Amino acid sequence: MPLSNNQKFYIAETVEEKALCNAVRNSNVNEALSLILKLIEANQFQKFNGDLRDRDPEETYYEVYYPLLSVAVLKRNFKMFEMLLEYGFKPHAISSGLNPETTPLIEASRCGRGDMVLKLTSILNKDELNYYDKDIKNSALYYAIKNNHVNIFNVLTSMTKGVDVDFEVSMEVTIISSNFNLFIHFFYNALQGIQDEVLRKGYLLQCAASKKIYK
């Protein structure tokens, strides 16, 4: 049975929880830190910011109080962003306030925040990246290409080595972008993970042909 609108996100119950949500939205780092420490002292922090990795991924984003990490990204507040990460707000567990199916990784790429992308990818391991659908990685890559953020593009493509990536989606995004430099870079970087030389050449030929069509 589908969840009703008022069931999709738990509501912050205590004064501290509501205040923390407001502090993050208002970019008040000092107040947010003070409230987090109060939650920890009252033994409420784990309940408020539980580790959701063991839950059904299809239900995970319904079981988050508030998308605080994504809000910090959208506010471009790196200090708040770092503080939330330090206190355990997991990037794979906190969904976007605008769309519950996106993550801070996508938001950071969309906002052009290379520092945030680098920070997120440095703490995400292979298992955590594969915990969500691979479209998340491709969506982050899409925004990097669309906005011509070469540094973010480089971080994301190096991150995909050894990780299951939908190459067809990534190829299409790179081709449509009509950014030839990124197009070439992608296939000599991300496709290094394909050991079969014939398969790798096949991808390159397919993309070269597609590039001509799109031109």
Curated annotation (Swiss-Prot):
Per the record's keyword annotation, is Repeat included, yes or no?
yes
Which keywords label this protein?
A: ANK repeat, Repeat
**Where are the annotated ANK repeats, by residue?**
64-93, 136-165
Which stretches are annotated as coiled coil?
none
Looking up InterPro entries in the UniProt record yields: Ankyrin_rpt, Ankyrin_rpt-contain_sf
Checking Pfam families in the record gives: Ank_2 (PF12796)
What is the name of the protein in this document?
Putative ankyrin repeat protein RF_0783
Q: Upper taxonomic classification of the species?
A: Bacteria, Pseudomonadati, Pseudomonadota, Alphaproteobacteria, Rickettsiales
